[in-house]
Design a protein with these regions (language model features):
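Positively charged n-region of N-terminal signal peptides that target proteins for export
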Residues: 1-4
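A short, Trp-centered hydrophobic/proline-enriched beta-strand micro-motif
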Residues: 31-49
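Gly/Pro-enriched, hydrophobic low-complexity segments
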Residues: 113-122, 126-198
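N-terminal signal peptide c-region/cleavage motif recognized by signal peptidases
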Residues: 14-16
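An acidic-aromatic
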Residues: 55-104, 168
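Cleaved targeting-peptide boundary
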Residues: 19-27
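Extracytoplasmic
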Residues: 36-38, 51-53, 59-61, 70, ...
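Soluble periplasmic/extracytoplasmic beta-strand elements of cell-envelope proteins
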Residues: 40-42, 57, 65, 83-84, ...
Length: 204
């Protein structure tokens, strides 16, 4: 499961041929995402038929935190990098936030027509709609689909598919707005010293 979590962190792209894109749905998603400052709630992650639950928080620009209930794992972004923290080993692995699914959702200005983002497919359902996305420069590794409830528009879930067809779903629940977090909430607390503060053009 930890391997699947790491895949969820890293993979975010793939082309989809002959798909249709409804620009009005893209604009609705973009408007909603730009209206969010902070969220907290729960999540259920499903991979290989196994569920893992935990707590989710985000604060734009650039901050994300996922705490897994039954594993010693945290994912925390400080606005620059995303840290995969294995508490049992007191070990941190770092990737640029811009290369992850979460990075799209917490940019300072979310522009889904940005040169580095491709919305390759939209699906309009009765109660929800979804956007399938990829990032340029990482084609062939997988793709991400973000699902939004319609009435009112709000984040429902995201899923990541790799090139082999393996899928990881993250469904959010009980999401509420929140902007007042503790000063160190989006920083890792560990035995060894590491700087977890920074930023870049997307998140400053």
């Amino acid at each position: 499961m930890i391997k699947k979590i790491w895949f969820l962190v890293c993979v975010f792209v793939c082309g989809v041929a002959n798909a249709t894109v409804d620009t009005s749905l893209v604009e609705r998603a973009e408007k909603y995402l730009n209206s969010i400052t902070g969220l907290v709630g729960g999540f259920v992650q499903t991979a290989n038929g196994r569920d893992e639950r935990g707590d989710f928080a985000m604060l734009r620009p650039g901050r994300v935190r996922l705490d897994y209930a039954n594993m010693p794992i945290q994912l925390i972004s400080d606005g620059d990098d995303l840290y995969f923290f294995d508490k049992s080993l007191d070990q941190i692995t770092t990737v640029p936030l811009t290369s992850t699914p979460a990075g799209i959702l917490v940019r300072k200005n979310i522009d889904l027509h940005n040169a580095d983002i491709n919305v390759v497919e939209t699906v309009d359902g009765n109660n929800s709609f979804s956007l399938k996305m990829n990032l340029k420069g990482q084609e062939g590794l997988g793709y991400m689909t973000v699902v939004f409830d319609k009435k009112p528009v709000k984040l429902n879930s995201w899923s990541v598919d790799d090139a082999t067809g393996a899928k990881t779903d993250v469904v959010f629940n009980n999401l509420k707005t929140k902007t007042n977090f503790g000063r160190d909430y989006f920083q890792i607390q560990r035995h060894k010293t590491i700087s977890t503060s920074g930023g870049d053009d997307f998140y400053d």
